[in-house]
């Protein structure tokens, strides 16, 4: 879980546009962010296994 200060800092507009970065909407994690779903890999996996993300199925071959 990210610190509240980092989450708040990421939400406000940066002084320069290059400084903007993505954070997970659920936990605030900045690394392993999946743009299409707006969350980190850990939250993505949890939500996918619970069936909360439509169209995502676990792959097996």
From Swiss-Prot:
Binds 16S rRNA, required for the assembly of 30S particles and may also be responsible for determining the conformation of the 16S rRNA at the A site. One of its GO terms (cellular component) is cytoplasm. PROSITE patterns: RIBOSOMAL_S14 (PS00527). The keyword Protein transport does not apply. PANTHER family: 30S RIBOSOMAL PROTEIN S14 (PTHR19836), SMALL RIBOSOMAL SUBUNIT PROTEIN US14M (PTHR19836:SF19). Belongs to the universal ribosomal protein uS14 family. Zinc-binding uS14 subfamily. One of its GO terms (biological process) is translation. This is Small ribosomal subunit protein uS14. Pfam families: Ribosomal_S14. Keywords: Metal-binding, Ribonucleoprotein, Ribosomal protein, RNA-binding, rRNA-binding, Zinc. One of its GO terms (molecular function) is structural constituent of ribosome. Zn(2+) binds at residues 24, 27, 40, 43. Part of the 30S ribosomal subunit. Contacts proteins S3 and S10. HAMAP family: Ribosomal_uS14_2_B (MF_01364_B). It comes from Chloroflexus aurantiacus (strain ATCC 29366 / DSM 635 / J-10-fl). InterPro entries: Ribosomal_uS14, Ribosomal_uS14_bact, Ribosomal_uS14_CS, Ribosomal_uS14_sf. The keyword Metal-binding applies. Its cofactor is Zn(2+). Binds 1 zinc ion per subunit.
């Amino acid at each position: 879980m990210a610190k509240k200060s980092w989450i708040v800092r990421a939400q406000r507009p940066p002084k320069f546009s290059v400084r903007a970065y993505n954070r997970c909407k659920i936990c605030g994690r900045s690394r392993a962010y999946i743009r299409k779903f707006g969350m980190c890999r850990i939250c993505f996996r949890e939500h996918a296994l619970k069936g909360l993300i439509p169209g995502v199925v676990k792959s097996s071959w």
